[in-house]
Amino acid sequence: MVGFGAPRRTGRLPPFVLVALLAVIGLLAFNYWSVSARQAALHDELLGLQAQVQRTEVARSRLEKRNSELMMQSDSHRRQIEQKQGEYQGLGERLQARDIQAQRCELDKSKLQNNVSLQMADISHLKEQLAELRHEFLRQEDQLHEYKNNNTFLQKSLQEESQQCAQQLAERKREYEENLTKQKEELDKQPQKDEEEGGTVDNKMHILPSEVKEKIEDPSSNRLPFAQDGIKLESDAGMPEIEDNEPAKEDSLQNDVKGQDTGALPSQSKSLLEKQPSLQPLSFTEHEVKKPLPDKKETVQIPEVEENALQLEPHPLKQMPRDSKTMSFNLKQSRFFDENESPVDPQHGSKVADYNGDDGNVEDDDHDGQADAGEYHKDHLNETL
């Protein structure tokens, strides 16, 4: 094939015919393409319409079913309405019955209000009675406090009376000591009288040991004046038995003999006795007296007397039932109660202490402190003696 610029050969179609044919072919191709595209669109539309028809058929069947259901529901609603109307009539009848019952309740309410007013009056009366009972309770409580105060006052008065008794006993003991010193002075003056009389001295020296022995053996002569009635201080107070005052007299006789052994004059012995501290009564409380004393017995003998002192033969004395500490404590303990007064009942004291509560414990602590002080005074007094 030759190009357009080449010389044209003879026997062939001209080029413009070829161009026209090509244009026709293109036009036909374009028409075919547009027709095919329109056919496809129409086919699609047909398919869509068919689907829409199917959907409308389905919707129609659904609507028919829905219509049948609605008809059934309308029938059921109609029946329900008829039933509700019957229930409404029943509720109306019940409402009338409730109205009648409400009227009855109003009547009952009025009756209850009347009863409440009566009960309120009763409550006010009971409150008045309660106030009276409270006043009575307060009055009895005041009486109880007054009774407690009276108990404490009685306890204090008993303590004061016991102290007064102890002071009286101390005064009697002082009188006893004065009488004892007078007897010692008379005993010191007796040898001088015997020497003046002459031949009667030997007879009196033989009689004197027997008299001393009888005095030591006879417990009634060694007792205090207020203890000679045979009254035992042991009573329901729980106090230990107060021994006789024989050890005190033996101790004083022993001190006298010791003073004569050392060659002391009667005036010097009297001055020594005056220099000794006086036995002050200690305030023993019931708590201290209740403690039993240890029962100790020691053998104490009077030493032999020299020949130049009264010219007495050595004479052994009887055994002392207690030592010096126990003896001094027995003397103080014997001073605690008078022979005409009974000791304080320990049960009464314990009841008062239990009744007062913590006050009894505080008094026990005070009694313990007084007991320690009393023991210290006793030890110091025994050392000085």
From Swiss-Prot:
Coarsely, its chief localization is membrane
UniProt keywords (A-Z) are: Coiled coil, Membrane, Signal-anchor, Transmembrane, Transmembrane helix
User: Which chain positions lie within coiled-coil regions?
Assistant: 44-193
Q: Does the keyword Transmembrane apply?
A: yes
Polar residues composition-biased segments: 265-283
Mode of membrane association: Single-pass type II membrane protein
Q: Which family does it belong to?
A: Belongs to the GOLM family.
Q: Ranges of Basic and acidic residues compositional bias? A: 170-193, 211-220, 285-299, 368-385
Choose one Gene Ontology CC annotation of this protein and give it.
membrane
Instruction: Enumerate the transmembrane spans.
Output: 13-33
The answer on whether this UniProt entry bears the keyword Nucleotide-binding reads no
Subcellular location, record wording:
Membrane
The chain's Lumenal topological domains, given as residue ranges, are 34-385
Compositional bias, Acidic residues, is annotated for 356-367
Q: Which regions of this chain are Cytoplasmic-facing, per the record's topological domains? A: 1-12
- Specify the protein name: Protein GOLM2
Q: Which gene underlies this protein?
A: golm2
Question: Residues annotated as region Disordered?
Answer: 169-385
